[in-house]
Swiss-Prot record:
Binds 1 [4Fe-4S] cluster per heterodimer. The cluster is bound at the heterodimer interface by residues from both subunits. The gene is bchN. GO terms for molecular function: 4 iron, 4 sulfur cluster binding; ATP binding; metal ion binding; oxidoreductase activity, acting on iron-sulfur proteins as donors; oxidoreductase activity, acting on the CH-CH group of donors, iron-sulfur protein as acceptor. Disulfide bonds: none annotated. GO terms for biological process: light-independent bacteriochlorophyll biosynthetic process; photosynthesis, dark reaction. Pathway: Porphyrin-containing compound metabolism; bacteriochlorophyll biosynthesis (light-independent). The lineage of its organism: Bacteria, Bacillati, Chloroflexota, Chloroflexia, Chloroflexales. This is Light-independent protochlorophyllide reductase subunit N. The keyword Cell cycle does not apply. Component of the dark-operative protochlorophyllide reductase (DPOR) that uses Mg-ATP and reduced ferredoxin to reduce ring D of protochlorophyllide (Pchlide) to form chlorophyllide a (Chlide). This reaction is light-independent. The NB-protein (BchN-BchB) is the catalytic component of the complex. Belongs to the BchN/ChlN family. Signal peptide: none annotated. Keywords: 4Fe-4S, ATP-binding, Bacteriochlorophyll biosynthesis, Chlorophyll biosynthesis, Iron, Iron-sulfur, Metal-binding, Nucleotide-binding, Oxidoreductase, Photosynthesis. Its EC number is 1.3.7.7. It holds the Pfam family Oxidored_nitro.
Length: 414
């Protein structure tokens, strides 16, 4: 059995795809992310990512001014020269934003025009008109795919799909070695020149639930086998992930004792989570595995909503959520009414709606944070659990009088 997906009429898009820069520029250490956008894009990146300009981060915004509206194509050569002189990148990602998309800028041609012999400039569609913010990583990985060497058919190794920090990557390498699973690498790797070979013998193991498109391309264009499993979030997901990966490589492993020990280490968090009612609004495409983890941790999932659900890519997660109300493209007005009626203990909500919910006395958590945190695998389980328990513990320490509507009367919209 599998959870029945209810589809409503809410917005498919939740937050700007440009924010994928926040974790990807740190992952791909010889890259530069150049956004063609407006002052709004620049303010978004600086404020959301919290990086000051004088820190000289490896991302920037080529600003579109009013005079550019009459030009056929923006002039970027001088900006590329400056990036090369200051940062010496091996690859530059040129990200689209809403305004140049509306202007019909021909990004593919623009990227080719400013590429150098030893410095590819790769177009990445990341506009909020087309993608949720986590899906923009999918676009970056699709841009990298042509630069992955073609592996021979007899090269039977694993490629982990999705960006994770170096500590989590080391954890996956260590666990694979312990289980005797040969690894070709990660997509993306820490350096552009180290991209893994991918071919018909490759087993692709997705680490993130928002990479359905690039996974499909790897299967179609390279003949790779894309593993279908739970995503490695929490002890339950991590056990299933490694057991299924071992099976795909012709090995049989039993990690039940490893899972039991992992849950045991999480007991201080589980004491807080058991019996709590949790409501997911839609934001980052990570809702399904997060809800599955919480359900197995003892929570009651009132609703798990996501902007987009891929029935094939998310099949195992949907099966694990059988009996849970799962909604695609939820109507937020309806959700507000349900939150008011059901009174959840915790709401996982968007950056834009969390503070207003808190203003109405709801205990809420930014869903945006999960994309930036090391929550995968055995080593990430405690971080994952802590992200749910922290707002609950913080609220429990507040004076009960702070929940009185008097404190927000007239401040928050009704």
């Amino acid at each position: 059995m599998s959870a029945t997906v209810i589809r409503e009429d809410g917005a498919y898009h939740s937050f700007c795809g440009l924010t994928c820069v926040g974790w990807l520029y740190q992952k791909i250490k010889d890259s530069f992310f150049l956004v063609l956008g407006t002052h709004t894009c620049a303010h978004l990146l600086q404020n959301v990512l919290g990086v000051m300009v004088f820190a000289r981060p490896r991302f920037g915004v080529a600003l579109i001014e009013e005079a550019d509206l009459s030009k056929q194509q923006p002039e970027l050569n001088a900006i590329i020269d400056e990036i090369v002189a200051d940062h010496h990148p091996s690859v530059i990602f040129l990200l689209s934003s809403c305004t140049p998309e509306v202007m019909k800028v021909e990004f593919d041609g623009l990227a080719r025009a400013v590429s150098r012999p030893n410095l590819p400039v790769l177009f990445v569609p990341a506009s909020g008109l087309d993608y949720t913010f986590s899906q923009a990583e999918d676009s970056v990985l699709q841009a990298l795919l042509p630069f992955c060497p073609v592996a021979p058919a007899d090269d039977r190794r694993v490629v982990f799909l999705g960006s994770v920090n170096d500590a989590i990557a080391d954890d996956f390498h260590t666990e694979a070695a312990r289980l005797g699973i040969p690894v070709a690498g990660f997509l993306p790797e820490s350096h552009f020149r180290d991209l893994p070979p991918i071919g018909p013998g490759t087993v692709v193991a997705p680490l993130q639930p928002y990479l359905a498109k690039v996974a499909g391309r790897l299967a179609r264009e390279r003949g790779a086998t894309v593993m279908t499993s739970l995503f490695p979030f929490g002890p339950d997901g991590t056990r299933a992930f490694w057991e299924d990966l071992a099976a795909a490589m012709g090995k049989a492993v039993d990690l039940s004792e490893r899972e039991r020990q992992a849950w045991e280490r999480l007991e201080p968090h589980l004491e807080i989570l058991r019996g709590k009612k949790v409501f997911f609004t839609a934001d980052n495409l990570m809702e399904l595995p997060l809800a599955r983890f919480l359900r197995n941790a003892g929570c009651i999932i009132l609703e798990c909503s996501s902007p987009y659900i891929n029935r094939k890519f998310h099949a195992r997660e949907l099966a694990a959520l059988d009996g849970v109300r799962v909604v695609e493209q939820p109507n937020f007005d309806r959700q507000l009414r349900d939150i008011r009626a059901l009174r959840p203990d915790l709401v996982i909500s968007t950056l834009a709606t969390t503070n207003p919910l808190v203003g109405h006395g709801v205990v809420a958590k930014w869903s945006t944070e999960f994309s930036f945190m090391p929550i995968q695998g055995w080593s990430g389980a405690a971080t994952l659990a802590g992200m749910f328990t922290r707002p609950l513990k913080r609220h429990a320490q507040l004076d009960p009088l702070m929940d009185d509507p008097l404190w927000v009367a007239g401040l928050m919209p009704g």
